[in-house]
UniProtKB/Swiss-Prot annotation:
It catalyses: (1S,2R)-1-C-(indol-3-yl)glycerol 3-phosphate + L-serine = D-glyceraldehyde 3-phosphate + L-tryptophan + H2O. The modification N6-(pyridoxal phosphate)lysine is found at residue 92. Keywords: Amino-acid biosynthesis, Aromatic amino acid biosynthesis, Lyase, Pyridoxal phosphate, Tryptophan biosynthesis. This is Tryptophan synthase beta chain. SUPFAM superfamilies: Tryptophan synthase beta subunit-like PLP-dependent enzymes (SSF53686). InterPro entries: Trp_synth_b_CS, Trp_synth_beta, Trp_synth_beta/beta-like, TrpB-like_PALP, TrpB-like_PALP_sf. The lineage of its organism: Bacteria, Pseudomonadati, Pseudomonadota, Betaproteobacteria, Rhodocyclales. The beta subunit is responsible for the synthesis of L-tryptophan from indole and L-serine. It comes from Dechloromonas aromatica (strain RCB). GO terms for molecular function: tryptophan synthase activity.
């Protein structure tokens, strides 16, 4: 592929991305773009970011060869990028630290965030505590119920959690409320968006703070295996963990990039969250991308066993990678993800997040079709502590 260089100056990834927001936000987005460009050019900012990643987050995260699982599947060797071992238990903190440092640099003492599974909310509350900032997290009331433990974590960390009762009471509604708050309190508030979506410069900025995942893999894989993997696999909701591991590999030839979407109860049922598999281009939350919408352009309600994948859109860069044919996107059902969750627990002693379990499930399908000398690298984007209640409930166990 010729050198990949996106987004353009206006935040477009081909026909996707851009800035579709109320005029009242243009100023704030321009201010953010300028502050980010200045921070990128400042070696002190980079040095502080790297220091925080090493000493606060615990990076680099290791890569683990899932030998027993690979043997059991009888095909390709599966390696796991262990983002679940980061402080706060997922990849989200990589981005939150970067944005909190930007907020501090811009003199904004208050940060807000939206969250689905609660992981981004916890990561935001964590960095707000670390930097002494006021923190408000918006969360769909449906997700507040599903993720009670994470809600309590956020409160312990000093954040105010606001349950959102509108719409489907999930991530997209939390995002709408967070946007409203930001418009009202632009003078003192920084909006820490948790995924590679939203208006420019967010998709670029979040990707840049997450690309540390793939950059580490580029160094670690040859050390472990003597070469780069044949395929990199990651789950895709909004898509920040996937973009973080994909981006450094885009110009590396011979490496397949496979994003795994939530097929929920099955693609044929309509109860899923697979916007790249079944969606059409449209505009939501400030950018143009693939969306799950009806004939009238109304967003349809999504479903996934995993709160973090339960979103009707996807980051615009994923939309562009799909159209370019550089990445492929595959759907995995709730039941397939749950099966992979249980298998990894028993075979490797690792409890994965339900989001990550979708990527694991696709790896389990793909590995047996490949030769034993092929290598699959799966981004294990988070740990499964937060999902204990959901998984137990599915198994008929009540705490």
């Amino acid at each position: 592929m010729s050198q990949y260089n996106f987004p353009d100056a206006k935040g477009h990834f081909g026909p996707y991305g851009g800035v579709f927001v109320a005029e009242t936000l243009f100023g704030a987005l321009d201010e953010l773009k300028e502050a980010y460009a200045a921070a990128q050019a400042d070696p002190a900012f980079r040095a502080e970011y790297e220091y925080e990643l090493k000493h606060f987050v615990g990076r680099p995260s290791p890569i683990y060869h899932a030998k027993r699982w690979s043997e059991m599947l009888g095909g390709a060797q599966i390696y796991l990028k262990r983002e679940d071992l980061n402080h706060t238990g997922a990849h989200k903190v990589n981005n939150c630290i970067g944005q909190a440092m930007l907020a501090k640099r811009m003199g904004k003492p208050r940060v807000i965030a939206e969250t689905g599974a609660g992981q981004h909310g916890v990561a935001t509350a964590t960095v707000a505590a670390r930097y002494g900032m006021e923190c408000v997290v918006y969360m769909g009331s449906e997700d507040v119920k599903r993720q009670a433990a994470n809600v309590y974590r956020m409160k312990l960390l000093g954040a105010t959690v606001v349950p959102v009762e509108s719409g489907s009471k999930t991530l997209k509604d939390a995002l709408n409320e967070a946007m409203r708050d930001w418009v009202t309190n632009i003078h003192n508030t920084f909006y820490i968006i948790g995924t590679v979506a939203g208006p420019h410069p967010y998709p670029m900025l979040v990707r840049d703070f997450q690309k540390i995942i793939g950059e580490e893999c580029l160094v670690q894989m040859p050390e472990m295996t003597g070469r780069q993997p044949d395929a990199v696999i990651a789950c895709v909701g909004g898509g920040s963990n996937a973009m973080g591991i994909f981006y450094p590999y885009i110009n590396v030839e011979g490496v397949r990039l496979i994003g795994v979407e939530a097929a929920g109860d099955g693609m044929e049922t309509g109860r899923h969250s697979a916007s790249l598999t079944a969606g059409v281009p449209g505009v939501l939350h400030g950018n143009r991308t693939y969306l799950l919408q009806d004939e009238d352009g109304q967003i349809i309600e999504t479903h996934s066993v995993s709160a973090g994948l339960d979103y009707p859109g996807v980051g615009p860069e994923h939309a562009w990678l799909k159209d370019l044919g550089r990445a492929e996107y595959q759907p995995v059902t709730d039941s397939e993800a749950l099966a992979a969750f249980h298998t990894l627990c028993r075979i490797e002693g690792i409890i994965p997040a339900l989001e990550s379990s979708h990527a694991l499930a696709y790896a389990a399908k793909l590995a047996p079709t490949l030769a034993k000398d092929k290598i699959l690298l799966v981004n294990l984007s988070g740990r499964g502590d937060k999902d204990m209640h959901t998984v137990a409930e599915k198994s008929g166990i009540v705490f």
